Amino acid sequence: MMARCRREGPILILQDTTGFIYSRAHPGKIGFTKTINAGRYKAGQLNVQTLCGVLMHSSLAVTLTGTPLGLAAVKFWTRRKYKGTLALKRHVNPTRVPIETKESYRWLENLRQSIALVGAPERCVHVGDRESDIYEL
């Protein structure tokens, strides 16, 4: 990939997170990704299910014409338990927690790895969704 990145012109580094979700008899052994509302039972109570699997945050390098150059950085992780962001905000002020301890730190890690791999930070244009809108980035 480094040889392909040495060409002239800007390189788009597209970052996003995806989840690999699995069904297992003992889901706690592979990590939690999120909880979902799976409808209602016949008795009327909510059927809330916990999804388990592995999360991946990747950075794909592409040219301005959309030609993929390869993965510039990848990070895999699991969660011991999932609490929504609203539940967390009730107990902890997110602005007082260091970025290195947050899950959103993956954006900075991938940015640094991508720049190190390409070797020309002035040519890298990093693109992310609204989740990447963090002060440290």
Can you say where each PLM-predicted feature lies in the sequence?
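Conserved, well-structured functional cores that handle cations and Mg-NTP chemistry
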Residues: M1-L137
